């Protein structure tokens, strides 16, 4: 991103509203991801040198200058918009006195009745869990890899709707079903047809919102996630899933899944909370109206 646009807007007295969807203005790595601690120690810029060297093959810690330049420009905008409070907190921990407003993303429900007549579903006595989306290292690939081995010979099946960076996960094996790419509007049907009971959103970076969580909830399926970022924030707020401590082990995750499987009453309560949440779920139109109101408040016409 070129910062000149802030300067030009200021020179011409053009009010700026800046919407942030990632952490690029804090670090060009974008996600503040550390494979050991999940969220990196972004507040300590002195420790950024080793990460910069590894990520960008540069032997200079440019993060203090990067943030100085961004801060000077961000101070000139009228308002900054982010999609979650966890994201807002990370930015305010970095840039103390910015004006930041939270506007959550909207999401439209899928029209049409799901197909509940899959004969394979009726025969299925397994507890089906799923990963959805493109699963990379920071999206929890290692947990997908480990769980597919852990569930072999059990009454738990793991499904992947989407793809991974590990080609070995892009094929079926015992207790593991690879579905591959999907069309977004088809996902609720696919999840229902395959009797998915739980979705694993085991992202290892502090996601700023998570559309995959929205897709899970629209499908009326509870989730498990780590206590990190917007996913945990949203799950806790509506009580629509279960939260794991950061750096939980495979055994911890498998134990939680087994506990959920054995607690149908608690599971039913989570589903009911999801249904209650969906009654007032923000649509894309609602989100657009929020943005329109914010922009019109700064436009004097």
Per-region residue spans from a language model:
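Short hydrophobic beta-strand element within catalytic cores of glycosyltransferases
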Residues: 198-201, 222-225
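Conserved small/polar residues in nucleotide/adenosyl-binding loops
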Residues: 299-301
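Conserved donor-binding/catalytic core segment of Leloir-type glycosyltransferases
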Residues: 81, 122-139, 145-148
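Nucleotide-activated donor-binding/catalytic signature segment of Leloir-type glycosyltransferases, i.e.
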Residues: 165-194
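A charged, aromatic-enriched C-terminal amphipathic alpha-helix characteristic of glycosyltransferases
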Residues: 251-252, 265-296
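Membrane-proximal helix-turn-helix segments that form the acceptor-binding/catalytic region
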Residues: 11, 41-79
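Helix-loop-beta element that forms the nucleotide-linked donor phosphate-binding surface
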Residues: 71-79, 88-107
